[in-house]
Amino acid sequence: MKQSRFERAICFAVNAHAGMTRKGSRTPYIVHPMEAAVIASSLTEDEDVLCAAVLHDTVEDTPVTAGELREEFGERVASLVLFDSENKREGLPPADTWELRKQETLDALSSAGREEQILVLSDKLSNLRSIFRSFLEKGDALWLAFHQKDKNKQEWYYRGIAEKLTLLRD
C-alpha cells in the first residue's frame, strides 16, 4: 500500500529526530512535532500544512536542509517549514540572540497568512503544553533548561504570539 505524503512526512521526521529528546526531559523529541500536527489537524485538512507541522523543526534542529524538504515534499511544505524556523545565527550563543530571534518571529507573524499562523500556533501551543507539564513537575527550575531563563521574557514572547494570530480569532 502506498503511503500518503503525510505518512511519509511522519517517517521523515521520526528519522530526522531519532535519538533526540525534549529540552530538560526524557520525552522523545518526535512527540512535539506529532502533537503540533494533531493541533494543526483540528484547524485544517490541508495536507501541506499537516506535513509542515510534523516537519517544522527538521531544518532548525537537525541536519535536514530546506532543499531536501523541497525535493521530498514540495515548495509549499518547505516554505511553511522555513517560515516557522528561526535563524539561529551560527557561531553566536543562543542566549545572546534569543530576543532578536523571537522578535523576528513576531514581526513575520504580522503579515503571515492563515496557514503560517496555524503552523506557528500548533508549534507554540505544543511548546506551552510541554512547559506547563514541566512546571508541574519542576516549578520555576524548569527555566534552567532554556536559553532564556527569565520567565517574564518567555511570557512576553508567548503573549506576543497570541496577539499576532489575528486570522485565527474567529
Give the location of each predicted region.
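Active-site helical microenvironments for divalent-metal-assisted chemistry
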Residues: 1-170
